[in-house]
Amino acid sequence: MIAKHLILSGRVQGVGFRDWMVTRARRLALAGWVRNRADGTLEALVAGDAPAVEELLRACRRGPPLADVTDIVETFAEPPAEPGFVKRATG
């Protein structure tokens, strides 16, 4: 299992990105969370089998139809303590 902390930049808020990401992460049996940040970026913690995490990262580079992802900063992280993948409030 691997875990990654992500910060996505570009047009990533107001385009349904969080719900889109929750759906894909759950399909891939990943754990973690996603939330909007006050600075206009999107933040996520994603954990699971390495191939599934990488598949979600590839999908995030495209994003949902109205999104325009210009950058993803990823760092390795500790896995979340709780199972499942959830949408969090803006932080």
From Swiss-Prot:
Catalytic activity: an acyl phosphate + H2O = a carboxylate + phosphate + H(+)
Positions of the catalytic residues: 18, 36
Gene3D superfamilies reported for this sequence: 3.30.70.100
Keyword ATP-binding set for record: no
GO MF annotation, one: acylphosphatase activity
Acylphosphatase-like domain boundaries: 3-89
Keywords: Hydrolase
Protein name: Acylphosphatase
EC number: 3.6.1.7
Species this protein is from: Acidiphilium cryptum (strain JF-5)
Keyword match Hydrolase: yes
Protein family per UniProt: Belongs to the acylphosphatase family.
UniProt gene name: acyP
Enzyme class: hydrolase
